[in-house]
């Protein structure tokens, strides 16, 4: 995250009381005087020699400390950390506690800017242990623990700091972020995240940007050893970043990255880019380096011609040579440039601003307090005219820079949301880019012990709600080719044809009311209604359609009568209500309601009883809105014994399929099987006798 390090040069500067030339002159003068003393005072005691040696060491140590301060002021954090570490190790633990505390704090500041949160935490702990007086060390320790994901320890440290500084907004938001992270631990996420190994090296690789009609190109910055030149950065200890790119082949596979062609890359840092809508102009961040001045960054442009990029041209945001300007992001319509700056007029740290690319006069706009904080708000990505993604360490988050999504509700008013894990982590997460769908790439230094940034891919897995089912006939045999239609109150309409086994599957929306209708040639339609849950989790539903045959009688299960009576019992209501639904779903059907008895009793008695029972069913249907013209009651007594179907055979394996349960056959059975056969013969069923009712 080199450019974030550069753009933070002017925040929390460390003390530097002596210019470099003065420090070096003093050191040289002191060394000369020491030689004179040694030549003219050979007879003095060893005590004086030792005293002078100690003084010499102290003077050189002070010189090193001044060098480290100058390195830090120039943003050379890596070099400064090496120098501070040498000074720290030369200081005695007991006799020089204040000095060790001060140097430990400055060393921690280097590690903080190098994203080495573990080392930073250790350094700040040492500063506090050696009684460094500035409570800022406690705040920075809390932030380092926060970035390590040590939320419980970070909470305690934030609370200690807030006891001394109760109104510090960064500490308050940090404390809130830690508590929220603890509460959300283990909450499932719909995002999948994987390291983009093809784009990553053993150094830092960051800020990917997808481009192309099919998002088949990706540009990113890298400090790989393949970057231009041999110079190592004093800021990071790595090579300065160059811009690389990769393309997909005909199979849709990413190819090995290469440096962009042309004059764009130099020995200085280049990276964090965005493109004009036509793709011919690149806006990118470039380091500015002047002798004896802090490294800063500016926005440059380059144009493409024949796949090569032109020499960079500085894009002058405003006439300001003291502020930093970087992280450009062009709006999809090409009208605006979003960028990051520490210029005056912000809310502290780095702020996100916007300027018109069409009419620049009077169009400079700070995005306001919904986006910008007292911390650093960086890496804007404009996905649409009203949706902005950015990273911030000032809003409550999981640690370091966290990714946020913001929807515009006014010029400077936004509704923002913190993106969930695993998009965010306790480390720095930034530089997100999207393809057309909810997938893309971003940058994170999670799990890297050196704090190096790497590119990760992500994909949002939508909530999957399905309904599966089967269509059978009354004998539980599948009805292949049955047509199932489903209509939702969200306007969705779907149609499926049942497979050979009668099964089907639909994908549903969340919290939608549906009506389903199943039908097939030779069968009556059946309709069912249900509502899917508005759940954030995957869900599966199951439904069964049992289609009555038009050509064969359909038994109505669970119709009960009292012994020797025709009155319907209460247990029969559910089955009869299902029949009412079938008749309402098939309004042109006329049916015969038939009742059958077992072999017991005379034919005349059974004929009368069965007819009265059939009429009881018809009367119930009429009472519940079915026209009498669509119903016919018929009693058959014991004259039509049941023929064993596949379903009956599955329930009663002792009866072979196709067997007629006649009185003669039943009498040949055991007593137990006779009772089972009599139960099968006692039934109420209906048959379709017309399809022309109007």
PLM region descriptions:
Residues 521-546:
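Structured interaction patches on ligand/partner-binding surfaces of diverse proteins
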Residues 74, 78, 113, 117, ...:
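Short, conserved micro-motifs composed of acidic
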Residues 80, 349, 475-489:
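Short, ordered, surface-exposed loop/turn motifs in non-cytosolic proteins
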Residues 392, 397-399, 596-694:
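Periplasmic OmpA-like peptidoglycan-binding domain that tethers envelope proteins to the cell wall
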Residues 512-522:
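A short, solvent-exposed beta-strand micro-motif common in secreted/extracellular proteins
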Residues 68, 465-474, 502, 545:
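A short, amphipathic beta-strand motif
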Residues 489-503:
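Short, acidic Ser/Thr/Gly-rich low-complexity loop/linker segments typical of extracellular
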Residues 549-589, 597-604, 669-691:
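Short, solvent-exposed beta-strand/turn patches at coil↔beta or beta↔helix junctions
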């Amino acid at each position: 995250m080199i450019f974030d390090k550069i753009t933070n040069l002017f925040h929390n500067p460390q003390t530097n009381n002596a210019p470099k030339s003065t420090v070096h002159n003093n050191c040289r003068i002191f060394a000369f005087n020491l030689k004179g003393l040694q030549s003219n005072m050979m007879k003095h005691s060893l005590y004086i020699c030792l005293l002078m040696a100690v003084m010499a060491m102290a003077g050189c140590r002070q010189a090193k400390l001044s060098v480290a301060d100058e390195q830090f002021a120039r943003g050379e954090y890596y070099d400064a950390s090496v120098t501070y570490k040498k000074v720290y190790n030369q200081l005695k633990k007991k006799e020089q506690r204040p000095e060790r505390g001060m140097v430990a704090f400055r060393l921690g500041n280097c590690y903080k800017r190098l994203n080495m949160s573990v080392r930073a935490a250790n350094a700040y702990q040492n500063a506090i242990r050696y009684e460094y007086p500035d409570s800022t060390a406690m705040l920075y320790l809390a932030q380092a623990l926060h970035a390590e994901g040590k939320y419980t320890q970070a909470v305690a440290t934030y609370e200690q700091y807030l006891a001394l500084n109760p109104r510090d907004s960064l500490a308050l938001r940090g404390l809130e972020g830690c508590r929220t992270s603890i509460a959300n631990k283990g909450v499932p996420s719909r995002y999948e995240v994987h390291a983009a190994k093809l784009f990553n090296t053993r150094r830092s690789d960051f800020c990917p940007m997808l481009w192309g009609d099919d998002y088949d190109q990706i540009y990113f910055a890298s400090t790989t050893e393949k970057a231009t030149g041999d110079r190592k950065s004093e800021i990071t200890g790595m090579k300065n970043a160059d811009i690389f790119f990769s393309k997909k082949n005909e199979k849709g596979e990413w190819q090995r990255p290469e440096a962009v062609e042309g004059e764009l890359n130099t020995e200085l840092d280049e990276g964090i880019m965005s493109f004009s809508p036509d793709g011919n102009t690149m806006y990118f961040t470039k380091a500015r380096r002047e002798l004896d001045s802090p490294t800063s960054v500016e926005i440059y442009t380059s144009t493409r011609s024949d796949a090569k990029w032109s020499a960079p041209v500085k894009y002058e945001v405003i006439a300001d040579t003291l502020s930093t300007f970087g992280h450009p992001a062009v709006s999809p319509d090409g009208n605006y440039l979003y960028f990051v700056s520490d210029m005056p007029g912000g809310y502290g740290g780095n702020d996100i601003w916007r300027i018109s690319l069409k009419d620049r006069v009077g169009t400079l706009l700070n995005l306001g307090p919904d986006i910008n904080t007292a911390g650093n708000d960086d890496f804007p990505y404009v996905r649409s005219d009203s949706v902005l993604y950015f990273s911030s360490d000032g809003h409550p988050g999981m640690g370091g820079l966290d990714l946020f999504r913001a929807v515009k509700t006014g010029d400077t008013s936004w509704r923002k949301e913190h993106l969930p894990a695993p998009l965010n982590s306790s480390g720095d997460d930034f530089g997100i880019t999207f393809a057309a769908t909810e997938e893309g790439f971003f940058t994170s230094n999670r799990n890297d012990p050196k704090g190096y940034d790497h590119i990760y891919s992500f994909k949002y897995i939508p909530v999957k709600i399905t309904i599966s089912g089967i269509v059978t006939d009354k004998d539980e045999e599948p009805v292949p080719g049955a047509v199932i239609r489903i209509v939702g109150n969200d306007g969705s309409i779907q149609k499926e044809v049942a497979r050979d086994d009668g099964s089907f599957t639909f994908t549903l929306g969340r919290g939608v009311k549906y009506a389903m209708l199943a039908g097939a040639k030779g069968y009556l339609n059946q309709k069912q209604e249900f509502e899917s849950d508005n759940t954030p989790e995957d869900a599966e539903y199951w439904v069964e359609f049992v289609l009555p045959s038009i050509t064969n009688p359909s038994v109505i299960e669970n119709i009960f009568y009292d012994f020797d009576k025709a009155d319907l019992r209460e247990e029969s209501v559910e089955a009869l209500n299902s029949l009412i639904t079938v008749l309402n779903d098939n309004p042109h059907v006329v049916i015969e309601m038939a009742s059958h008895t077992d072999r017991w009793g005379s034919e005349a008695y059974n004929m009368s009883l069965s007819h009265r029972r059939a009429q009881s069913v018809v009367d119930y249907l009429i009472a519940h809105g079915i026209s009498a013209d669509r119903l016919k009651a018929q009693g058959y007594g014991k004259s039509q014994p049941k023929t064993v179907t596949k379903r009956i055979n599955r329930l009663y394996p002792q009866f072979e399929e196709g067997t007629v349960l006649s009185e003669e056959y039943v009498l040949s059975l055991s007593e137990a099987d006779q009772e089972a056969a009599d139960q099968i013969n006692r039934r109420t069923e209906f048959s379709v006798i017309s399809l022309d009712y109007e």
